C-alpha cells in the first residue's frame, strides 16, 4: 500500500513532531483572551510548538527552522508569535505558548481520533509508536486507554530504522522487491 493509498483510506495521518506547519491544523487560536485568525504563511512549525512545550529538546529539533534562525526557546517563541502576524513583544511568552498548546492539542486530538477509528475498522487491539514523537504518542494513547508499544523506548537508536525496515518488508511481501 502506498502513502497515497493510505491517505485515501484514512490510514495515514500526515502530521509530525518536526515539520508540520502550524496553519495545517489551526485556522484560529485564542491568544491573550482574543480569538485570532492564523496566517497561512510558513512562519513556524510543529518543532517550535513541541520545543516550547518541552516535548522535544533542542537536540531533537533536527530540521531547518522556518526562518533560518537558531533553534532556541526564545527563537521558537518568536516564530510562533509570527503565526498571528505578531512579534513576541506584542503577545508575550504566554501568548506564543497558547499557540503552541492549541496546535499540539489539535494534532493529538486528530491522531487519537483517527487511531481509534482505524483500530475499530481493523479490529486492532494495540498499536506501535516509533520516531521522534513516540513518547508523546505513548502518553497520549495511555491517557486514551489504548495499549501502545514505544519502539524507541524498547529498541533505542535502532528504532529509527524500523519504519524503513517495515516498508521494505511490506514491499517484499507484495512483490515490489
Question: Which functions belong to the PLM regions below?
Answer:
Residues 1-177:
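Helical "lid/coupling" subdomains associated with nucleotide-phosphate turnover
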